[in-house]
UniProtKB/Swiss-Prot annotation:
GO biological process entries: translation
Role noted for this protein: Allows the formation of correctly charged Gln-tRNA(Gln) through the transamidation of misacylated Glu-tRNA(Gln) in organisms which lack glutaminyl-tRNA synthetase. The reaction takes place in the presence of glutamine and ATP through an activated gamma-phospho-Glu-tRNA(Gln).
Record InterPro entries: Amidase, Amidase_CS, Amidase_dom, AS_sf, GatA
Gene Ontology MF terms in the entry: ATP binding; glutaminyl-tRNA synthase (glutamine-hydrolyzing) activity
Organism: Wolbachia sp. subsp. Drosophila simulans (strain wRi)
Family designation: Belongs to the amidase family. GatA subfamily.
Assembly: Heterotrimer of A, B and C subunits.
UniProt keyword annotations, A-Z: ATP-binding, Ligase, Nucleotide-binding, Protein biosynthesis
Record protein name field: Glutamyl-tRNA(Gln) amidotransferase subunit A
Length: 489
């Protein structure tokens, strides 16, 4: 049964078509693993829903027709607990929504399930998607499958989609839905040695995705290979009338663009990303992969993105301001936690004090301050102006180049029991935040292991709506570096 869990999505699909195994057998193998998992990746398990999808898939395959709904039919997947799932508890890993059961389905999870995928359950995450280590969850931290070699210490899986990345790396599911606001798909994918892609802002509907920072939030996917990411992303992209920023631009068949050819492509290396604090091992792999792409016909050039140094403060001002606004709805009146009190004002105060964790409260306070009448122009408005400059840096760069190659994170994953300063945690997103501020597509792909035996990764950033292009470049990197897979226990 463990052998079935090792398969890629493409291999699962081929095996189901050839009747080498049934969807029920495939899903049962994963259900057994989920029931016995020790990573704390799943917080709500839905084996009955997964088995229903598996039986439907087997019935379809028994007809011996090639009119499959999608290559995801019967494939076991997990869904980050930020996406509303009708009739299934959706908590955003917060005490505030501990018992919230949505009456509707998010668009992306609906598309995924309609493609025939078998949902194994809801995945752990940082509370309201705020964090870079998955240590801010009301349901406890997630463990990475990788162990630090020198001291045998457990390490963090990254965040906020830590449950998504850990579950895929741990062979608990073949792929997982995540969300990416400032790097929450790409950074955990990097820490766990898997592939994570954030599409262009607006490619995937935000409807039914619990809001964190609306001008940045975007759904994404995490898988064990680039081709698998293409298949999953195809399933969840597309125009949605229920999301005002949803793009009407047609979605190509992304998997068909993966041809392993980068001849004639121009790849930029921004000098501003060569900053203090980057691991020497990551720099070495960055230079090695750039040389490999050059050997395969790509032109590699130095570029400048001059406003990169402002990305972190700009991001945290904007996302905190939007957090303050979006989370104002959690007041104990309509849904979620309610703490009874003598007055309405006291009920508001007690409910929010008990319902939100420390990191969420920190960002609400920062955001409220930035949006206050005396500071709005000084902080929020200025941050939006600099965001436009960061976006323009990318637009100008893409007039001369096709893709940008940068690290996904400055270091390998840190220890699960280490308590970094919140400011240090923010800086972990230094390489992922700029693309988020600009709304560009980006993919993290593993490139090797550190001396500590922990995954290292690079990121390919593309122009707007060029998900197909970054997937292809990532596939070339994957061919060179191989897949960084931890042996299945």
């Amino acid at each position: 049964m463990n052998e079935l869990r090792k398969l890629s999505i493409t291999q699962m699909h081929d095996g189901l078509k050839k009747k080498s195994f049934s969807a029920v057998e495939l899903v049962e193998a994963h259900i057994s693993a989920v029931e016995n998992e020790k990573l704390n990746a799943f917080i709500t398990k839905t084996p009955e829903i997964a088995m229903k999808a598996a039986k439907a898939a087997d019935e379809h395959f028994s007809r011996q027709k090639d009119d499959l709904i999608s290559p995801l039919m019967g494939v076991p997947v997990g869904i980050k607990d930020l996406f509303c799932t009708k009739g299934i508890k959706t908590t955003a890993c917060s005490k505030m929504l501990e018992n919230f059961v949505p009456t509707y389905e998010s668009t992306v999870s609906d598309l995924l399930l309609k493609s025939g995928a078998a949902m194994l359950g809801k995945l752990n995450m940082d509370e309201f998607a705020m964090g870079s280590a998955n240590t801010n969850s009301y349901f406890g931290p997630v463990e990475n499958v990788w162990i630090r070699k020198s001291d045998g210490e457990k390490v963090v899986p990254g965040g906020s989609s830590g449950g998504s990345a850990a579950s895929v790396a741990g062979f608990l599911c073949a792929g997982a839905l995540g969300s990416d606001t400032g790097g929450s798909v790409r950074q955990p994918a990097a820490y766990c040695g898997v592939v994570g892609i954030k599409p262009t802002y607006g490619r995937c509907s935000r409807f039914g995705m619990i809001a964190f920072a609306s001008s940045l939030d975007q759904a994404g996917v995490i898988t064990r290979s680039v081709s698998d990411s293409a298949l999953m992303l195809e399933a969840i992209c597309g125009y949605d009338t229920k999301d005002s920023i949803s793009s009407e631009k047609p979605v190509p068949k992304l998997s068909s663009f993966i041809n392993g050819d980068v001849k004639g492509k121009c790849i930029g290396i921004p000098k501003e990303y060569r900053m203090d604090g980057i691991s020497e091992e990551i720099v070495h792999n960055w230079e090695r992969v750039a040389s490999y792409l050059k050997e395969n016909g790509a032109e590699v050039v130095d570029i400048t993105l001059p406003h990169t140094k402002y990305a972190i403060p700009v991001y945290y001002l904007i996302c905190s301001a939007e957090t303050s606004s979006n989370l104002a709805r959690y007041d104990g009146v309509r849904y979620g936690l309610r703490v009874d009190a003598d007055t309405l004002e006291e009920m508001y105060s007690l409910t929010r004090a008990e319902g939100f964790g420390k990191e969420v409260k920190r960002r609400i306070l920062i955001g409220a301050y930035a949006l206050s009448s005396g500071h709005y122009n000084e902080y929020y408005e200025k941050a939006q102006c600099i965001r436009a400059l960061i976006r323009n840096d990318f637009i100008k760069a893409f007039e001369k180049i096709d893709y940008i190659l940068v690290p996904s994170a400055p270091t390998e994953a840190f220890g699960l029991n280490e308590k970094p300063d919140p400011l240090i945690m923010c800086i972990n997103d230094v390489f992922t935040v700029p693309a988020s501020l600009a709304g560009l597509p980006a993919i993290s792909v593993p490139v090797g292991l550190s001396n500590e035996g922990l995954p290292l990764a690079l990121q390919v950033i593309g122009n707007y709506y060029d998900e197909a292009g970054i997937l292809n470049v990532a596939s070339v990197i994957e061919q060179n570096c191989g897949r960084i897979i931890r042996p299945l226990a």
